[in-house]
A protein has these predicted regions:
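Central hydrophobic cores of alpha-helical transmembrane segments
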Residues: 217-226, 269-279, 319-322
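Interfacial loop-to-helix transition and helix-capping segments at the boundaries
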Residues: 47-50, 75-87, 181-194, 232-250, ...
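Membrane-interface helix-loop-helix regions
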Residues: 84, 124-196, 297-299
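Functionally critical transmembrane alpha-helices in membrane proteins and complexes, commonly lining
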Residues: 46-103, 120-123, 322-327
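Juxtamembrane transmembrane-helix termini
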Residues: 28, 32, 36, 86-118, ...
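Solvent-exposed interhelical
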Residues: 196-224, 258-269
Length: 398
């Protein structure tokens, strides 16, 4: 998520084992009051607020980055929640929706194609825009030679390296310069690596048949909680193992919700309780996810499922475009001298200038790329039908 998955997933059906309340009432004095609807019953992929939540989370990432990109720092005890919960929420939603995607259509080729089409085309175009438009504009604003930058190998090298997520190639010929956070044109790309690894994990689990049962999700989640707790220190120095534990744990929490969706009650009271747990854990624990990964996933997924208002059903998913274009636009704002603004004001300006790029990315790139999924699916199934038909024809006695 990367930031931005789940489009096109068929509606999740209600649990067929849930009896009608009148039938239960007729069974006699042993009846129990129903606990209310489950997540499976309230979640409708055609009418939900998950796209709204993802856009909110992407905007939260802009707010989070407005501190370091203006040369400021978020101080304890609010730093953990403020700097991590937004992306963690993305991964939790993704864990729920990606698991649903595999269960709905457990074909590896189509799964890989769908994930690649969601992430890569938008990313590649974004890299080209950064290298050949945003970076030269930034150089020109600072009095440098945009033509010299464009004639060098640096823009092409930036695109090629980051296109395969070699994200350590963060700058373009040393730019951006003379800003509070120099040398990095898009500081969110590294999270896409972990998103892709989570996609791979779902594919491996699906091929192995582990998504057909509930217990593997429980075992994996418990192991990740232990792993995440063990690598939580030192807190001030983020290691690769801490990153793995962080993203894998919240993604697994979303997947766990999917696997138990017909058992999990969907109530606003539990959403509120989950939010309180996330807040308390974020303020009191060095790694809030050890206690609050499931509450975070519950809060964002179930609240999104409970909201069925048509106006909050976004047909356009701008969250991915906002996510990948916001940092370079914030750097450009800093180059223009706006880093003196208070971070909240800086974030508002960044949202305003980023949304048009996100909209162009969705309508011109991402949406068109996603439309190819149906073509790939029809071709794959058409080829399978031809092979199957040929096998039947060539079988003696058929």
């Amino acid at each position: 998520m990367r930031p931005g998955e789940g489009a096109g997933i068929a509606p999740v059906s209600a649990d067929p084992n849930v009896s009608d309340p009148t039938t239960i009432a007729a069974r006699g004095p042993a009846r129990r009051r129903l606990p209310g609807p489950t997540l499976a019953q309230v979640f409708d992929t055609r009418v939900n607020a998950l796209n709204v939540w993802r856009l909110v989370l992407a905007s939260g990432v802009i707010l989070q980055h407005s501190w370091p990109l203006t040369g400021r720092k978020v101080h304890p005890p609010y730093d953990q929640l403020f700097t991590q919960v937004w992306v963690d929420g993305f991964f939790a939603i993704s864990g729920f929706l990606i698991a649903a995607s595999w269960v709905r259509n457990p074909r590896l080729r189509e799964y890989v194609a769908a994930r690649a089409l969601r992430i890569l085309p938008g990313l590649w175009v974004c890299l080209v825009v950064i290298a050949f438009v945003i970076a030269p504009i930034g150089v020109a604003i600072q009095g440098g030679s945009a033509a010299k930058l464009l004639m060098s190998r640096a823009p092409i090298e930036y695109v090629l390296h980051n296109a395969v997520l070699h994200v350590f190639y963060a700058g373009i010929d040393g730019t951006p310069r003379h800003v509070p956070f120099p040398g990095v044109w898009d500081g969110v790309l590294w999270t896409l690596i972990f998103e892709i690894f989570c996609y791979i994990a779902i594919a491996v689990a699906g091929v192995a048949g582990l998504l057909k049962r509930r217990w593997p999700a429980v075992v994996v989640f418990i192991l990740l909680v232990v792993f995440s707790a063990l690598v939580a220190y030192p807190v001030e120095v983020q290691t690769v193992f801490q990153m793995i534990g962080r993203f894998a744990l919240v993604f697994a929490a979303g997947t766990l919700l999917h696997q138990f969706q017909d058992k999990i009650p969907a109530r606003w009271s539990l959403v509120a309780l989950s939010a309180v747990i996330v807040l308390a854990a974020g303020l009191l624990m060095p790694n809030y996810r050890v206690l609050a990964a499931i509450p975070l996933a519950y809060a964002v997924v179930v609240s999104g499922a409970l909201i069925h208002h048509e106006r909050l059903r976004l047909r356009t998913d701008l969250s991915y475009g906002v996510y990948i274009y916001a940092w370079p636009m914030q750097q450009l704002l800093a180059i223009c001298g706006l880093s003196f603004l208070p971070p909240v004001v800086f974030a508002v300006v960044a949202v305003v200038v980023t949304l048009p790029l996100a909209a162009l990315s969705w309508f011109l790139v991402e949406k068109r790329a996603l439309s190819l999924k149906s073509r790939i699916k029809s071709r794959a199934r058409g080829w399978g039908a031809v092979v199957s038909g040929g096998s039947r024809i060539s079988t003696p006695g058929s």
